[in-house]
Amino acid sequence: FESFFEKILKKQDFKSELEKILDNFNEIALINSLYNSFYRLFKIALYAKINGKIDFKELLGYTPPPQVGQNLSSQAFSLKIEQYKEIFTLLLKSEYELKTNPKLVKKEFLISNLLKLARILKN
């Protein structure tokens, strides 16, 4: 999942990994994983804005290796607060639709929402 998430963040073509991801995750689990990953980055960005520094021990409960910490920081700051808002809104609406609409073709719906997510990240 991490390499898939990185491809989404780096605005690379993630279609090749999407099939593998859809085979291993159900649609709601994938939405929740994306939400959790973006939320972790959002927490890092907000913490840095409020405190002027990043303390991974306080944020995540552990101190990641320096390279991982640097990667998380750069990912967190690559997005604007407004983009985070749009991402969370999209993911929550997607999860709601998946749970409440029994006539939905889930795989196609998820792909269309991932394309919307990619569009949000490119802005």
Q: What is the predicted function of each stretch?
A:
Residues 1-10, 14-123:
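C-terminal alpha-helical interaction modules of replication/initiation AAA+ assemblies
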